[in-house]
Amino acid sequence: MKLLNAALLGLFIASTAFTSFSDEKKTATAEHLQNVSVTIRSEGSFSNGEGSGVVFTRKDSKGNLVNFVWTAAHVIDNLRKERKAVINGSPKTIVEFKDPMVVKEIRQGGRTVGRLQMDAEVLKYSDADDGHDLALLRIRKFNFVKDTVTFHLGDEIPNLGDDLLHVGSLLGQMGANSMTDGIYSQHGRLIKSLNKHVFDQTTCTAFPGSSGGGVYKKGNAHYIGMLVRGAGEGFNLIVPVRRMKDYCEEHKIMWALDPKVEMPSEAELKKMPIENTPKEKEDSDAEKEAAKKLFPYMLRVTYPKVLIMKEMKQND
């Protein structure tokens, strides 16, 4: 009897220890994903956009922490401007971007205790309609955060049914990120109306403000894709990290995903084109508008009060 009681006690202690470990891991994962997640705010001339992003941190040659941010291109497309210039006697179209704002909320003891916000420059941009819907930013201040995301860079594709987590800025709540869970419900979705790009599918709940937010494997918190569009509860589309790898390899920026790849110098970064020559458009404008209705962006859009007041006066 004593042996049985001792055995039962041992099982209870082991079970409690396992549960505690699981809870600790869950808490650590949630804290880590909160630390690498940010809100992206874009203040354009006619509208403001609010979405999400994830921080990838590198060290430069001087030991400074350089914080890069991946987000969806459609989150910042209202900041894009073109101007004409004559360079060496030839007319050129110059593409420029106003700085988006990266917002990070500081929480302690279960409550918000402050907020950090920094300007970021746009380093790379591949538009949503005819490109990959990806944007790479660099926060202008060194050492903004020390945390960094880990990308799933292996060749294996996660299995259908794998547990996933998504972190995004609910309704653009400016730095306080919400976490949802779901499963990997499908991969390799080839959607003609979305320029025949491959998307993966998840049941993780998304909301306006989720665009650009990371989707992660629940077991190790590795980033497996970026949430960009939704078509109803339980049906959301992500740009898989393997597509991001293809884009980075094509444009020689694997250093923005893989910490083992040497980071370019400041001079080399300045020479890097923000946009590369887009491929020939395959879809009509009507098809693109239809796609936006079927699979809308998970972006929160607001309008400046001045613009609203002007429209109201015009309608009087």
Enumerate the predicted regions with their spans.
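Flexible, gly/ser-rich surface segments that form the specificity/activation loops bordering the active-site cleft
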Residues: 23-28, 124-128, 146-198, 205-211, ...
